[in-house]
Amino acid sequence: EGCSYCWRIEDVGGRSDRVYRSGEYWAQNAREEIAEAGADGNINPRYVEVNFNQACNFKCSYCSPHLSTTWEKEIKEFGAYDIVDGEHNNLDSLSKQRLLPTKLAQNENPYVTAFWKWWPELYRTLEVLRMTGGEPLMDSNTFKVLDYVYKNPNAWLEMSLTSNMVPPKPILMDMFIEKLQRLEEIQIWEDPEKFNPNSGNNWYVAPACKNFATFVSVD
């Protein structure tokens, strides 16, 4: 079903993710291997995005219960939001779309187990790894990945992590900074609006700015 998403877009004349992504550098590096493998071949992807779980301490308006446990908790308590086009963040609708994650302990999640079984082989040719969430700093697998990368250097790997920079426990940010200090190069992308005192996010701006300042000072 995952592939059919791109097929449907292409059938109506759209530009699908697979067409867009196939033009990026990491895909070009695998062209010969893809051609040799053929249509029925099986090769390791060069670009992987992983979401270990939906745990998050925020409920950003543009987000959703299937990507934030805090959002899910609020919707369960108060119900979906009535808007012009219907109900926003309706749990029944998300469930029918099979977007709500299965409630399992980390050590019982078959998808996480499968990821770590595959990881050593995948890592050999991986060029881009994105860790999203939820809030990635709330998941131990994020730190496990960082430890593995440190112990097994990959000069070709570009790794990114999407974080709100204010995990619920300060020690999580401390651990993150400690791991980053061991990496060779760090690049930062941020949205200035999120750190704007006039944005209405005053409760968030102060701790976020503090953590962000520490983050950018990592050498």
Tell me what each language-model feature is.
Residues 45-55, 66-110, 123-140, 152-174, ...:
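Core AdoMet radical
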Residues 1-2, 48, 115-118, 145:
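Alpha-helical packing segments of well-folded alpha/beta enzyme cores
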Residues 22, 112-114, 199:
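Acidic, low-complexity intrinsically disordered regions
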Residues 1-53, 62, 66-89:
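Flexible mid-to-C-terminal extensions adjoining Fe-S/redox cofactors in radical SAM and related proteins
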Residues 58:
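Glycine-centered loop/turn positions within well-structured domains
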Residues 28-41, 107-120, 174, 180:
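A Trp-anchored, charged/polar loop motif used as the substrate-binding/catalytic surface
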Residues 25, 115-118, 188, 202:
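Residues in intrinsically disordered, low-complexity segments of regulatory proteins
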